[in-house]
Amino acid sequence: MEYTTLAVLAGLPEDPHGAVGLPIYAVAAYGFKTLEEGQERFATGEGYVYARQKDPTAKALEERLKALEGALEAVVLASGQAATFAALLALLRPGDEVVAAKGLFGQTIGLFGQVLSLMGVTVRYVDPEPEAVREALSAKTRAVFVETVANPALLVPDLEALATLAEEAGVALVVDNTFGAAGALCRPLAWGAHVVVESLTKWASGHGSVLGGAVLSRETELWRNYPQFLQPDLKGQIPWEALRARCFPERVRTLGLSLCGMALSPFNAYLLFQGLETVALRVARMSETARFLAERLQGHPKVKALRYPGLPEDPAHRNARKYLASGGPILTLDLGDLERASRFLGAIRLLKAANLGDARTLLVHPWTTTHSRLKEEARLQAGVTPGLVRVSVGLEDPLDLLALFEEALEAV
């Protein structure tokens, strides 16, 4: 089936009352009729026990995401940040190393530097080019971490080449597919990535109303290289032998949900399940508008530089054509310096907010917001300059948006 068909049909459970929509299971715990039934649920993990671990509403969302991303398994969590943390918790142990792309989302860099460091994990930042990654690999490397589209540098890595390299090295390629819009724009697992993490807060939600995140993984024998999957668990089982490729998502569920409690609300799961039904339509419209704006603002005398992967002359265009369904709904304008960016943002009659994927166009100044906690050198390495403005294009009329941008540029 095609993506748009799966988006409305996949994951919808049969309902004893014949409901044609997804019910919200707003309960904390699930009862047992007998001692033996409770014992079996705890022993096997089948069925429902406590909503922190799993619930039917979240399960339906996981099934839909699996279909849309082409995944073996999916685990949904409270936010995209929770998803990234849970995936890395499942992969890493003290003394391990991660090779990460320069130019990641600011909070991901913060997670690496302020949390993973407490676990004794070292992160090496390199350009997300295969040779640079190869040179950074060591015997301690357990993961390579990149974004589908760098936020906000808008560079697109060669996912297939990186996946081949990671497979040869016996380490996991983890891709933050937030900019891939739940598979509507990109499906990294199809290109060989072992793990996908993503924020569902963005395009999956579509209205900036809920938080959510997901970890997805594919069929692979890679987990045989990780000691945590070859040692007995609390049930006395060897995870790899008992679960094969599902040992990784099960560890994500155990660590991220059961033990760390980063559970997704069933209300949020319901809204995200619903949002996925229209994500492909919204992303296609937003991408068309983003290209329209990029083509008309490119070369504007008040714009020092414009980045949009859908433009043929953009540095990311070659990889974008291969990996993305379109140029995407994000573009950036560099207005030259902080003062010019401030005047532009003060004049434009659109929302200024540190979010993406909303039905409304959102603008943000990464230098003073999303990347402000990084040192200046790190910001510049991430492609963030004092004059840069990131634009997440919404569903407004393209001509109206162009008029608003041109009006604001007159104030620069």
Curated annotation (Swiss-Prot):
Temperature-activity profile? Optimum temperature is 70 degrees Celsius. Stable at high temperature. 80% of the activity is retained after treatment at 90 degrees Celsius for 60 minutes.
Q: How activity varies with pH?
A: Optimum pH is 7.5.
Q: What is its EC number?
A: 2.5.1.-
Gene Ontology terms for molecular function: cysteine synthase activity; O-acetylhomoserine sulfhydrylase activity; pyridoxal phosphate binding
Q: Which reaction does it catalyse?
A: O-acetyl-L-homoserine + hydrogen sulfide = L-homocysteine + acetate
On this chain, the residues bearing N6-(pyridoxal phosphate)lysine are: 202
Instruction: Cite the Gene3D superfamilies for this sequence.
Output: Aspartate Aminotransferase, domain 1, Type I PLP-dependent aspartate aminotransferase-like (Major domain)
Q: Which UniProt keywords apply?
A: Amino-acid biosynthesis, Methionine biosynthesis, Pyridoxal phosphate, Transferase
Q: Name one GO cellular component term.
A: cytoplasm
* Cofactor(s) required for function per UniProt: pyridoxal 5'-phosphate
Gene Ontology biological process terms from the UniProt entry: cysteine biosynthetic process from serine; L-homocysteine biosynthetic process; transsulfuration
Tell me one Pfam family matched here: Cys_Met_Meta_PP
Q: Which domain of life is it from?
A: Bacteria
The cross-references to SUPFAM superfamilies, in alphabetical order and at most eight, read:
PLP-dependent transferases (SSF53383)
Q: Which PANTHER family match?
A: HOMOCYSTEINE/CYSTEINE SYNTHASE, HOMOCYSTEINE_CYSTEINE SYNTHASE
Q: How does it assemble?
A: Homotetramer.
Q: Which family does it belong to?
A: Belongs to the trans-sulfuration enzymes family.
- What is this protein's function? Catalyzes the conversion of O-acetyl-L-homoserine (OAH) into homocysteine in the methionine biosynthesis pathway. Has weak activity with O-acetyl-L-serine, O-phospho-L-serine, L-serine, O-succinyl-L-homoserine and L-homoserine. Shows a very low CTT gamma-synthase activity.
Kindly provide the name given to this protein in its UniProt entry.
O-acetyl-L-homoserine sulfhydrylase 2
